[in-house]
Structures are given as structure tokens and as C-alpha cells.
A protein has these predicted regions:
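ABC ATPase NBD coupling module
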Residues: 71-87
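Catalytic Walker B motif of ABC-type/P-loop ATPase nucleotide-binding domains
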Residues: 165-168
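Conserved ABC transporter NBD signature motif
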Residues: 62-70
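Short coil-to-helix segment of the ABC ATPase nucleotide-binding domain corresponding to the Q-loop/switch region
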Residues: 98-107
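A short, proline-enriched helix->beta-strand linker immediately N-terminal to the Walker B motif
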Residues: 159-163
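Conserved ABC ATPase signature
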Residues: 140-150
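Helix-to-loop junction immediately C-terminal to a conserved catalytic motif
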Residues: 54
Length: 237
């Protein structure tokens, strides 16, 4: 039977950035297998939603649950456990530049409680194969292209078999062809594994070419709209 319990759910939630409220009354559900885009102009609260989802920004008003955790009452010590249930991919990759690809991934596994060396190396091999980077395990990040570094970042996000991948402008620093490859990878993970994906983007071509649900951030609100009806946004490639 299909699971209809949302992985992410907000009801009448006010999203803050520091002391300022940037979005009022957010209603949003993300279910297993969903691909949800968050789009809008710069400064409309897109990244603040992401930061709230990963419990980097607090939730004071309204309700919000992510991977079974209530964001209004989550304890500081519980936040690492919440984040283990999700994968996070950033625009700037955030790889550790002083260690190899394999050691980057090993660091994450050790930090999230893995102990068995054989199991860790097996998991690293599995995720690198999933993103087509199995031959790059012993490379340093600076030896990789931007697209390859982003593939490694996606592999890192898959290590703990997340319920959802949170991607903040994952194609923002990439050329069109490389960005297309990253989108094929993400949509493949979404379809093949049923992993939900929430992705911030400013690139209209992406959500037109790779269909998903579209949430628009505008005028201190965020609401769902059909992709082919998104005509009033000043967002560019």
C-alpha cells in the first residue's frame, strides 16, 4: 500500500531569516517519491525554507514536521539524527579539499555512526557507482570538474539512504550541459529509488524540462503552481 504520510509537512508556518519573517503562512507537503521545485526571485525566502527543513533556522509559528521530527520542539541533540534521514546538496559542493573523494565519504559515514570498515567501503563503492564516479575514489576534489564535484556531493547525500534529498541550487555554478547531467542523475534517483527531492532553482528551463511540483516564493508567500503557468517570475538561466 502506498505511503501517504508526508516526509515534510508545514501548516501555516512562518519562515524566518534571522529576525525577519520572509514567508508567512507556508502550507507544504512532500510525500515519498515527490520531486518539488522551490522557485522565485533572489531574497524571496527559498533558501530560508531549506534552512528551516534542515533545522538550521528555527520555526516559531505554525507547525512543521520533517522525517518524523516536530521542528517546533526538536532538541539540539536531535538535529544530527534528523539530518541523517535526509541528504543535503549545496551549490558550492562543500567537499573537504584536503582529502580524497573516498575519505570525504568515509568522514561522513564515521560522523554518522558507522563502525565496520568493510561495510563503509562497500557503501562508498555503491554510492559512487550510482553517480558514475566509481573511478574517482582516490582523486582529490581539485582534480575534478565542477560537475564531477557535484556528483560526489550527491553521492555523499545518498550515503545513509535518505528519505529525502534537499538540494539548494545544485546546478547554479554549472554550465548548461553539465547541469543537464546533474538533473538526469537527480531525476533518476527520484524515479528509481523513490527518494523524494526538494530542489531550489532559479532556472526555468530545468523545471520545464524535468517536470515536478513547483512552489513559487513571491511577496512573502510560497504557493504551488503548475510549471506551465509560471509566467510572472523574473528568473533566468
Amino acid at each position: 500500500m502506498e505511503d501517504k504520510t508526508p516526509i515534510i509537512s508545514f501548516r501555516n508556518a512562518d519562515i524566518v531569516n534571522g529576525e525577519a519573517t520572509v514567508i508567512y503562512g507556508l502550507d507544504m507537503d512532500v510525500f515519498p517519491g515527490d520531486f518539488v521545485y522551490i522557485v522565485g526571485k533572489v531574497g524571496t525566502g527559498k533558501t530560508s525554507i531549506i534552512r528551516t527543513i534542515i533545522s538550521e533556522n528555527p520555526l516559531y509559528k505554525g507547525s512543521g514536521t520533517v522525517c518524523g521530527y516536530d521542528l517546533k520542539v526538536i532538541k539540539e541533540k536531535e538535529i544530527p539524527y534528523l539530518r541523517r534521514k535526509m541528504g543535503v546538496v549545496f551549490q558550492d559542493f562543500q567537499l573537504l579539499m584536503d582529502r580524497t573523494v573516498e575519505d570525504n565519504l568515509l568522514f561522513v559515514l564515521q560522523a554518522t555512526g558507522w563502525k565496520n570498515e568493510e561495510q563503509m567501503h562497500k557503501r562508498i563503492t555503491t554510492v559512487l557507482k550510482a553517480v558514475g564516479m566509481e573511478l574517482k575514489a582516490h582523486k582529490m576534489p581539485h582534480q575534478l570538474s565542477g560537475g564531477e564535484q557535484q556528483r560526489i556531493a550527491i553521492a555523499r547525500s545518498l550515503l545513509n539512504e535518505p528519505q529525502v534529498i534537499i538540494a539548494d541550487e545544485p546546478t547554479g555554478n554549472l554550465d548548461t550541459e553539465t547541469a543537464d547531467g546533474i538533473m538526469k542523475l537527480l531525476t533518476g534517483i527520484n524515479k528509481d529509488k523513490g527518494t523524494a527531492i526538494v530542489m531550489v532553482t532559479h532556472n526555468r528551463q530545468i523545471f520545464e524540462k524535468y517536470p515536478g511540483r513547483v512552489m513559487i516564493c513571491k511577496d512573502e508567500t510560497c504557493y504551488e503552481q503548475k510549471a506551465d503557468e509560471v509566467i510572472d517570475l523574473d528568473i533566468t538561466i
